[in-house]
């Protein structure tokens, strides 16, 4: 099969994995940079809102408007043959929302490249942005790494730090870090694919972890939290899980 050289100089077809709203930042960045996105893998349409209306992920809508094939497997092995039909594909993953099995990882060269919004090995897990705000860190950042079976434990291609001024909200920081990560990915992808940029293993002894958030995380106990701690949670949990506090007989949504 012949390869098409794009304006980016990259010929390997890209399979993009992503589901969340901010996954669209990365997909759009790849497409607008002229990179050869051959397919988008996302979760099946899901019921959302009070009316439980079946809603497509934003990346699916975007891909369809740009004539990019969309794959929505319930299990990734369902698309193995589709991936194998591509000529030496590379994977890019941004908040797909499912664990990628080893057999799927092995279908890609040099693997699946992941954009993670923290300075790994700090904050491995699903809530690094919220954790940085809640803990009132003075900096965070973004990492592009090679995906492995263990959560966020793969070797690192590049990182970019980002200073925090203790005013950031969750939605703002999501947009900022995933835009930063997308720009980093686009700029470094040629060097990654050529082998010029080699990943460096993480120091597992320095790893810290963050958990999946639940609605209960938004409950503010104003008798134990300092004003600064409460304010940080309000900024970190804006949108979901949203913060609430009980004052007297009233529960206030903040």
Task: List each model region and its residues.
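N-terminal beta-loop-helix "entrance" segment that forms/cooperates
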Residues: 46-64
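Internal anion-binding site segments
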Residues: 2, 204-254
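Short acidic-hydrophobic, aromatic-tinged amphipathic segments that line or gate anion-handling sites
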Residues: 70-75
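Donor/substrate-binding cores of folate-linked one-carbon enzymes
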Residues: 12-13, 33-36, 90-209
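Short, well-ordered alpha-helical microsegments
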Residues: 23-25, 79-80, 100-102
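N-terminal Rossmann-like dinucleotide-binding module
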Residues: 2-50
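Short amphipathic alpha-helix with an adjacent loop that forms part of the alpha/beta core around
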Residues: 77-87, 106
